[in-house]
Amino acid sequence: ELDITKMQWHDDFDIKLALKDITHATVDRIKANRQARENYLEQFGGDKKGPYLYVIVATGNIYEDVTQAVAAARQGADVVAVIRTTGQSLLDFVPYGATTEGFGGTMATQENFRIMRKALDDVGVELGRYIRLCNYCSGLCMPEIAAMGALERLDMMLNDALYGILFRDINMKRTLVDQFFSRIINGY
């Protein structure tokens, strides 16, 4: 049984040293994602001129969302937004793995982000253009979902503390701090 009150405390320097390789590898992955996006845009002749055609998928099943997203891209969609399942903004954790049961939307998980990004990259290569992926990280796990999005090359991540304050009764201080931190991640 784990008793966190009896765990050995480590010096801040030792903690930072232990995390150094992990953080550098993670930052390198995010930089590589940004470069991959730039490479796709260059390969396909630059960015689109004019407004983007933005579509929403929200079946609750990531695999059905992929089917709809690919069809939308073939019909001209420039941005695919995957709507989160009802109530995910109130979860104080991020579910793990691919999900197939959501209500009014699909769970925002790192695996779901990865699955959709791959599908959009594949259809983008077929169509000769870059398809952007959008999701949402408002609510209790803003920084965590923003970090997952950066790791899986989401192009747009909407986050708004007021959503949680007005519609989910989330503590104002917490959600504003979360918004600040998640926007630092998104801005990187």
Predicted segments, located by residue:
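Metallocofactor- and cofactor-centric catalytic cores in central/energy metabolism, strongly enriched
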Residues: E1-I170
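Active-site pocket-lining/capping segments in soluble small-molecule metabolic enzymes
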Residues: L158-Y188
